[in-house]
Amino acid sequence: MYSIYDFKYPSDWIEPTADDKCIYDCYKEVINYKLLDENKQTFQYYYGTLSSTINFYPLCNYEQLVIACRFLTVGYLIDDFLESNLVDSETSNLMSKKIENILIDGEYLDQSNISNIEKYTMFFRGKARQFVGDKINIFNQFIKFFVEWINSINPFNKAINLNNYDSYNFFKKVNSGTYVTLSMAMLLNPNTKVDTNIWMNPRFERFVCNGAYQMSAFNDCASYAKEVRSNCHLTNPLYFLQKEIGSFDQVYKLILNFNNKIVNEICKDEELLLKECPDDQKDDLKYLTRSMKLILGGNYSWSLKCTRFNDIDSPFIEQRSINPDVIAYENIVDKIIKL
């Protein structure tokens, strides 16, 4: 038996969660847009998944949290649907293209066939654009990362022959969602003095890239049982590295060692970034780098509490559950998107 508590984080990476009112209010929106049926099971799915919002962005106010919750609603519903094996390759590619068209152009790809998730994505895009005011560069940066993440889902799901951890991490750099999640943190603070050119800084790029590696390393463990259940585990290193390294135990130790190394590198790069930063931008850069750490720490604390990853066969003791109220996500998402 293994424990997710084996992952170690600096104490300042984890804060108490923000208020959860945003989740209830966004659930009402989801029901109004007919993305989910209104019942106990869909609420538990939604709350368990979208409680990530109040863990990722624990220091945000209600207005900020609602924007973040809408973003994560779009992201998780699309991700879960595309990963659920409920649609063929042509349909999943069409879905990605439709969402991309909304995010970039603010238009529906096919006016005669608009799904409810497209309508909600358009609604979210409008609210996010309104939130940033005249800071169009911040909005565009966020849209860029969101589209890249959406377009990474199908290729990653098809990458069934992964057998190298370096190649895998190259894939997961985008597919982990870390870049877009941090970009959302910047969008939530549109009056920042930090220019979007920060994303071109090679040290900041390495800082975020290592954050993506860390999130992936942890998520591989947290989601392992869920992926086995839905037959999506072939791209999980806990599975494919056993062919190269040996036992599950050996692979898990390798991932833990990798995690510890990455955490140290993140801390080192943050220190150097702040040292190099102009004084008038330092507070806002601290906000951004701390946001990265809180997203990573929040991802950890959220995964320990939510039912999304629960499975009686999980190798991790914290995730084992026989609670009859816990429902597998793939039994929910088949009703989400009607193309």
Swiss-Prot record:
The keyword Oxidoreductase is annotated on this UniProt entry: no
Motif annotated as DDxx(x)D/E motif, chain positions: 79-84
GO terms for molecular function, please? (+)-beta-barbatene synthase activity; metal ion binding; terpene synthase activity
Source superkingdom? Eukaryota
Q: Induced by what? A: Expression is detectable but at low levels in vegetatively growing cells and increases during development induced by starvation. Expression is highest during he ultimate stage of mature fruiting body (approximately 24 hours after induction).
Motif NDxxSxxxD/E motif: chain residues: 219-227
Give the UniProt record's GO annotations in the biological process aspect: sesquiterpene biosynthetic process
UniProt catalytic activity: (2E,6E)-farnesyl diphosphate = (-)-beta-barbatene + diphosphate
Query: Mind listing the UniProt keywords for this protein, alphabetically?
Result: Lyase, Metal-binding
Q: What is its EC number?
A: 4.2.3.-
Domain-level remarks: Contains several highly conserved motifs that are important for catalytic activity including the aspartate-rich 'DDxx(x)D/E' motif and the 'NDxxSxxxD/E' motif, both of which are involved in complexing metal ions to coordinate the binding of the isoprenyl diphosphate substrate in the active site.
What family does this chain come from, according to its entry? Belongs to the terpene synthase family.
Biological role: Terpene synthase that converts its substrate farnesyl diphosphate (FPP) into the sesquiterpene beta-barbatene.
Its recorded name reads: Terpene synthase 7
Q: Which gene encodes it?
A: TPS7
